Amino acid sequence: MTNNEIIAATDGSSLANPGPSGWAWYVDENTWDSGGWDIATNNIAELTAVRELLIATRHTDRPILILSDSKYVINSLTKWVYSWKMRKWRKADGKPVLNQEIIQEIDSLMENRNIRMSWVNAHTGHPLNEAADSLARQAANNFSTRSAHIPGPGWTERSAK
């Protein structure tokens, strides 16, 4: 870790998979965001959290460490994406890559940026992961009950530690 590296946790939640779903990214109490839908899968929610973090931070040149409890997301974005691109977005079995559109978008957002990803074990007390998990679950619950969803403050260089 460098001293100006942004450390952010991302998480997604789907109540029925597919069902009411939420996503969140979290840096600190002043720097986070969340959202969701009436129906989506957990993987779409997890990927959306990463995409939204990368969009929010697109104007910073600081390195970013993304913490995720989704091995699917980490493997998709750091390992499998290279072979999928070589195979024209087909898996080894010849079938199309699931969630291809959002994975392509994230891959583009990661281009020419210093982005690292690291897996964290879910629900083990990691403070950033727990915060992102809570916000994603709250967003999913808001969409489930059709309650108003209030997004977070988002990203500014000044607010991020």
Swiss-Prot record:
Q: Which CDD domains does the record associate with it?
A: RNase_HI_prokaryote_like
Keywords, sorted A to Z: Cytoplasm, Endonuclease, Hydrolase, Magnesium, Metal-binding, Nuclease
User: Example GO biological process term?
Assistant: DNA replication, removal of RNA primer
Annotated binding of Mg(2+) 1, by residue? 11, 46, 69
Q: Where in the cell is it found?
A: Cytoplasm
Instruction: Tell me the protein's name.
Output: Ribonuclease H
* Function statement: Endonuclease that specifically degrades the RNA of RNA-DNA hybrids.
Q: Where does Mg(2+) 2 bind?
A: 11, 133
A Pfam family? RNase_H
Q: Which domain of life is it from?
A: Bacteria
